Amino acid sequence: MVSFSEITTLGVGGSIACFIECSPDEFVERAPGLFRPGHHVLVVGGGSNLVASDCPFPGTVVRLKSRDTIISDDGNYTRFSVSAGTSWDDLVSYTLDLGFDQLSPMSGIPGTFGGALAQNISAYGAAVRDVLGSVEVYDACTSEVVTFGLEDMRYGYRTSALKNVRNKVILGGTLLLKPGPTPVLYRQLANALKVDLGTYCSGKQVRDQVLRIRAEKGMLPRYLVPKGFDVCNTSSVGSFFVNPIVSKEHLSRLRRLVPQGALNSSVIQTDEMGGVKVSAAFLLEQSGFEKGFCISGSQAAISTQHSLAIVNRGGATAAEVIELAGLITRTVSRKFDIHLIPEPVFVGLEL
């Protein structure tokens, strides 16, 4: 019997009553029988953004297989039609090999294409929403396959109309890419590449540097970690909390609670909606949660390389992960009156 601990990058979670792997087309054929009243269905990708309960899951878990990516001309763009089960990083590497560099800043992000669309991934100045053409979705309420456009996805910071929605399943989608190099739009990446912001660099240069940065933070899947880097922090869901957005008034109160000058441009930035995005890692550190912190006797800990990652040090349970995450959110809320929002999807759990 398959368990969530086997199919998730965090490596926790109970057994699954029924586990199925199938292509998107096979899923559409079988779906009406799966989405029956009283039966739980969960469709997963790479399991890189999922925290499941230690209790047995009584329903069906479906993992979609990948299929060949189809490439076609679309006027000023090249259209890549990609299945939901395709590895995101494999897609990045594939497009780079063909001379399309736009996805290179998002190298090394674990999980699948479907998960990337649902979670609205972004990294180092690039975002999946910026190149999205369409999303193919199975609607379990109507048993039909429908197409979502960019507006239908209602993208927000690390979220979309399809995140945490069980009756709509992403089958695949299209990206609209242009060949050639891409400008470096993120300060940390520009510094690492030793170039000015806006400089056009080859996708290979960008990818190599992004993978190195992620490896230094312990934020790469184990199989992508370059030789010589530590792999002890790879059992995680990446960043466990999203960076909170606060009002400018709240930011003023926050300044009085932290050391003078601590709230600089490296930990805050203006949000596109007029608020201020604050580094969740900064809030954790200011609340006393150092890298490597763990509750006594627990195998769940904060990564020794990145303050926002909760890692499984070996044999951790979902209960231990939630216990640590709960302690963090309560402490940050009490100290700064800021509620941290978890980034991963919870199955059978609440924080």
UniProtKB/Swiss-Prot annotation:
UniProt enzyme class: oxidoreductase
GO terms, molecular function: FAD binding; UDP-N-acetylmuramate dehydrogenase activity
Record key words, sorted: Cell cycle, Cell division, Cell shape, Cell wall biogenesis/degradation, Cytoplasm, FAD, Flavoprotein, NADP, Oxidoreductase, Peptidoglycan synthesis
Gene3D superfamilies given in the database record: 3.30.465.10, UDP-N-acetylenolpyruvoylglucosamine reductase, C-terminal domain, Uridine Diphospho-n-acetylenolpyruvylglucosamine Reductase, domain 2
Main location: cytoplasm
Cofactor: FAD
Subcellular location: Cytoplasm
Stored InterPro entries: FAD-bd_PCMH, FAD-bd_PCMH-like_sf, FAD-bd_PCMH_sub1, FAD-bd_PCMH_sub2, MurB, MurB_C, MurB_C_sf, Oxid_FAD_bind_N
GO cellular component: cytosol
GO terms of biological process kind: cell division; cell wall organization; peptidoglycan biosynthetic process; regulation of cell shape
The keyword Cell division appears for this protein: yes
Pathway: Cell wall biogenesis; peptidoglycan biosynthesis
Occurrences of domain FAD-binding PCMH-type (ranges): 11-213
Active-site residues per Swiss-Prot or TrEMBL entry: 158, 239, 343
Catalysis performed (reactions): UDP-N-acetyl-alpha-D-muramate + NADP(+) = UDP-N-acetyl-3-O-(1-carboxyvinyl)-alpha-D-glucosamine + NADPH + H(+)
Annotated EC: 1.3.1.98
PANTHER family: UDP-N-ACETYLENOLPYRUVOYLGLUCOSAMINE REDUCTASE
Family of this protein: Belongs to the MurB family.
Function: Cell wall formation.
Protein name: UDP-N-acetylenolpyruvoylglucosamine reductase
Species, as recorded: Tropheryma whipplei (strain TW08/27)
